[in-house]
Design a protein with these regions (language model features):
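Hydrophobic ligand-binding cavity/cleft-lining segments
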Residues: 1-44, 139-142, 150
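Beta-strand elements of well-folded, non-transmembrane domains
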Residues: 12-14, 59-61, 74, 110-114
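Glycine-rich portal/gate segments that line the openings of hydrophobic small-molecule binding cavities
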Residues: 40-89, 103, 135-150
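Beta-strand/loop substructures that line and gate deep hydrophobic ligand-binding cavities in soluble
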Residues: 82-135, 140
Length: 150
C-alpha cells in the first residue's frame, strides 16, 4: 500500500487571519464547499480543535462518508481534519501572502489500497480530489471577498 497525497493551493484575496477563521468555523466552512460535498453535519464543537464533523464526498462516481476530528497543530496557520474510520488526513495551511491576501493550501494524504484497485486509486483519485479542492479554494476566495465587502 502506498501513501497517496493530493494538494491544491490558491491565493485568497483576504487576510490570513480572516481566512483561517472561515476554515476553522465549521458553521461557516460549508458555505464554500463544492457540490461534491454533501450531508455536512457538526456532531460536536463547531470551531477549531475538538470539533467533530460528518459528511460525504462524491468523486469519480464513488461516494464516501467521512467522520472527521479537527485539531490545530499550529493555531492560526494549520488546521487538520483526521478521519476516524480511515488513514485519511486533510490539512488546511494558511499563510499571509502580502497586500492583505493569503496563500491557502489543502493537502490530503491516505494509505492507498494494494493490487489493481490500488493502481486505479493512485491514478484517478488524486486528479478527482485536486479538482474538488481547486473548486473549494475558488469558492473560499469568493466567500472571503464577499465577507470583506459586507
Amino acid at each position: 500500500m502506498a501513501v497517496i497525497q493530493v494538494t491544491a493551493e490558491r491565493t485568497v484575496n483576504a487576510p490570513a487571519e480572516a481566512v483561517y477563521g472561515y476554515i476553522r468555523d465549521m458553521h461557516t466552512h460549508p458555505k464554500f464547499l463544492p457540490p461534491a460535498f454533501s450531508d455536512f453535519h457538526i456532531e460536536s464543537g463547531g470551531v477549531g480543535t475538538g470539533s467533530v464533523t460528518r459528511f460525504k464526498v462524491t468523486a469519480g462516481g464513488r461516494t464516501r462518508e467521512y467522520h472527521m476530528t479537527v485539531d490545530e497543530p499550529e493555531p492560526g496557520r494549520v488546521l487538520r481534519e483526521s478521519d476516524q474510520n480511515s488513514s485519511l488526513i486533510t490539512k488546511f495551511i494558511v499563510d499571509p501572502a502580502g497586500s492583505g491576501s493569503s496563500l491557502v493550501q489543502i493537502s490530503t494524504t491516505w494509505q492507498g489500497a494494494g493490487g489493481i484497485g490500488g493502481f486505479f486509486e493512485r491514478t484517478f483519485a488524486p486528479r478527482a480530489m485536486r479538482a474538488i479542492y481547486e473548486d473549494e479554494l475558488q469558492r473560499l476566495d469568493a466567500y472571503a471577498r464577499e465577507q470583506q465587502t459586507a
